[in-house]
Every structure is written in structure tokens, then in C-alpha cells.
Amino acid sequence: TLFPYTTLFRSGEIYVKKIPSMKVVDIANSVSKDAKQEIVGIRPGEKLHEQMIGDEDALHTYEYDGYFKILPAINNWSSDASRIGKGKKVPVNFRYASDTNTEWMSVSALQKWIKDNKNKIGNN
């Protein structure tokens, strides 16, 4: 499904959906708990954590139920009450990343999600 807030989109805004984080090992175990796993270390270019909103964007970021909205810094749009609506300003040092996320998806929850979404992700 398309992000359900598309009717809210206005020029220059960035929407970031709140989603649970998960560990690569948990993803592997969700797909096949019997698959052989080998720890090889971090490879060139590989990241340990994914950052969706950095602290440099916190000045223009507001929190809503289910998502964050980053407002454009130009033309004072980030202080426009009609763009902010019912949003709550995030703290100055805020970042939304997999290592700071408080919501984590368990192996069983991921297995259920995979089962429920087979038609969207395929059978391989």
C-alpha cells in the first residue's frame, strides 16, 4: 500500500513512517531457522544501523501518530502552523535510527508479517 498520508503531502515535505527495527540475524532466522549462518564481520560500505532522520533535520521535524514530517527549511515553511498541524516538535538532538528506535520486531512477528504479505513479496 502507498503511504496512507498522501493526501497530506505538500511541496518540499518529507514523510518518514515509523517502523520497527530488526536485526539481520532475526531476519535470517525468520526466513529459515535451520539455515547455516557465518559471521564474516563488517564488509566495505556496510552499515550497522540505518538512520532515517538525522539530528541536522531535527530543527524542522515534527512527530505525528505513525510518522514524522520534515518540513522544508526554506521560506520559513518549517514554522508554518498550517504545515505543522497537530505535530509535536522533536527535541533538538533527535535522530530516528535503527539503533535508537524503541520498537523492535521479534522473529515471530516478522514470520507473521512475511506470511501475511506473501502476495506482495513473492515466494522465494
Language-model region placement:
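Acceptor-substrate binding/catalytic loop of class I
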Residues: V16-I19
